[in-house]
Amino acid sequence: MKTNAVAFEKFVNLADARLGTKIISVTDDWFADANRLFQPTPAVWKEGIFDDNGKWMDGWESRRKRFEGYDSAVIRLGVAGSIKGVDIDTSFFTGNFPPSASLEACFLAAGEPDENTQWTEVLPAVELQGNSHHYHEIHNHQPFSHLRFNIYPDGGVARLRVYGIPYRDWSAIGDDEQVDLAAALNGGRALACSDEHFGRMGNLLNPGRGINMGDGWETARRRTPGNDWVIIALGHAGEIEKIIVDTLHFKGNYPDSCSIQGAFVKGGTDSQIETQSLFWRELLPSQKLEMHAEHSFVEQIRALGPITHVRLNVFPDGGVSRLRLLGKVKK
């Protein structure tokens, strides 16, 4: 299953708590709060820790069902989008995991689902194992705003990851409106990087400033010549007018300097784009960076016209919390 997961895990986790994902309703979360499903960190085991309802578990856990039926949770995604794949993670749930689970979805421009909502099955019931990741591709290209996560008949799940492409009505953006074209909420996604040993590349595009050093992109210490880099696909083609490189929380491990290249890419696979990025034009010439600071660049930006992709180069290595690419949409 992991071979299928590699491709879609590069997409944005639409169910990330940092994007605003939350439980709207749940049939039962007696043992463990269902909102834990969306935490960005891996599930943990706390030996010997109990609360008033029993063993503390890092995930959603319902009571043992003593009547007909099954448990479900209605979820509002932090950002609506088309789903590419899901990971149902039962880490540390061994004698208390559900034997199976399914997913339904709907799209609402406003409000929450009710008894009249029409749900679409996006993942038929699949078997689950204890203490395991379950990766499944989704073959429905509609945008969805809400999910109904069903577990049969009861039990616990540690995490639910929902990878996809955020939906944004770009026609509603004004011609003179400046937006962050790289933001995860606007469909930006990190495609590839040289290294992400200490922090995932996708963190660069999360909303808000970083929570801590782990909530950014950080590479291992480079012991060979060269520099580290990350390639980002913008949510929409546009002209960049302002760049923000934020090294918040990175003090003894921030890059000495950075530069950015850009291009209007018309096609090709992610791996082909990685190779082509070596020859992209310079959008932002090399700039010195400081620790634990937000760096804004406007006058230093070179006019490349509309672009779809950028390559952030850091010299020689280190950590960056956030990257913002503000500009106007090319319609």
Curated annotation (Swiss-Prot):
Cite the PANTHER family for this sequence. ALLANTOICASE, INACTIVE ALLANTOICASE-RELATED
Q: In which pathway does it act?
A: Nitrogen metabolism; (S)-allantoin degradation; (S)-ureidoglycolate from allantoate (aminidohydrolase route): step 1/1
Question: Into which family does the record put it?
Answer: Belongs to the allantoicase family.
Q: Which Gene3D superfamilies match?
A: Galactose-binding domain-like
**Keyword Hydrolase set for record:** yes
Per the UniProt record, the source organism is Pseudomonas fluorescens (strain ATCC BAA-477 / NRRL B-23932 / Pf-5)
Gene of origin? alc
Which keywords are on file for this protein?
Hydrolase, Purine metabolism
Q: Which reaction does it catalyse?
A: allantoate + H2O = (S)-ureidoglycolate + urea
Annotated disulfide bonds: none
User: Can you say what this protein is called?
Assistant: Probable allantoicase
